[in-house]
Amino acid sequence: MKVVFTFFNLFFLAGTVLLLIFTVLSGSSKHFPLNKFYWLEADTSGIKNAPANRSAWTFWGVCDKADYSNCLLGPAYPISPEDNFGTTADIPKDFVDNENTYYYLSRFAFAFCLIALAFSGLAFIIDILGFCFEIIDKVVIFLITIGLLFLAGFASLQTAVVVLAKNAFKNDGRYAHIGAKSMGIMWAAFACLLICWLLIFAGTISNSYKKHIARVKAEQGQYSQPTHGPAGDESSFTRAAPPTKDEENTGGIRFFKIKRNQKVSDDESV
């Protein structure tokens, strides 16, 4: 059973790590399939310093949606046109009024994603040793729990900022479209890690319960072992007084025994 649990843990951990790697690599190349992953596509025509009339925000920056040839890239690149393009002219009003909201949501989401990937990858490597060492499960539970918390934070923050940005462009009369592939991969990674956490947590509880039951049965077996002393009618009191025959009701039997013996003696004398 432990081998089965470990196999499924590795399967879902590998899925989480792979999906997060796809998320991190989104927008890093103009070639298929990485050019299909983006958070938001929006109409940026007329905005100064925008890479194109139709721009796409990826994990690393904002690019020309047509061919990803013209990009503005950087670590923790926010979905905030005012910070991206260095101007407020023709920028949707909500981006200007709530600049800090878009800026910090995006940057914290970036950091949370990398932390979640690090903990998930480390848990995957260590969990391979779970086939040999039982104590590994406790270490893996800790790593997966931390990774799950940061991945939940990343998915929540990124979803929030993407939806807010889409609504901001829509309210300004501009086209905006959420990248379903990137969003789906992000939430699929969270689902895989959550399933992995539930499996390993359930397996640990099951093993602990089995050990507890075995320990209780062992203790009960020690207390229920029979003693070597006298039991029942074999006590010292019973053995001290050997059973006696009832002398009152054996007179007739003794009479016939005596008469029989006398008859045998008379025959011998004759």
Swiss-Prot record:
Signal sequence segment: 1-27
Subcellular compartments: Cell membrane
Disruption phenotype: Leads to defective tolerance to cell wall stress and antifungal agents targeting cell wall components, defective plasma membrane structure, defective endocytosis, impaired lipase secretion, SAP2 over-production, increased adherence, aberrant biofilm formation, defective macrophage killing, and decreased virulence in a mouse infection model.
Positions annotated with a glycan in the UniProt record: N53
Primary location recorded for the protein, binned into one broad class: membrane
Single GO BP term: filamentous growth of a population of unicellular organisms in response to neutral pH
UniProt-listed Pfam families: SUR7
Regions of this protein lying in the Cytoplasmic compartment: 129-134, 206-270
Induction field: Induced by fluconazole and down-regulated in absence of GOA1.
Residue intervals on the Extracellular side: 28-107, 156-184
Disordered, as annotated region: 220-253
Coiled coil: none
Ranges that cross the membrane: 108-128, 135-155, 185-205
Keywords: Cell membrane, Cell wall biogenesis/degradation, Endocytosis, Glycoprotein, Membrane, Phosphoprotein, Signal, Stress response, Transmembrane, Transmembrane helix, Virulence
Membrane topology reported for the UniProt record: Multi-pass membrane protein
Family, per entry: Belongs to the SUR7 family.
Reported function: Involved in cell wall, plasma membrane, and cytoskeletal organization. Plays a role in endocytosis and hyphal morphogenesis. Required to restrict septin proteins to the bud neck and prevents intracellular growth of cell wall. Contributes to secretion, biofilm formation, and macrophage killing. Essential for resistance to stressful conditions and for invasive growth and virulence.
Protein name listed in UniProt: Protein SUR7
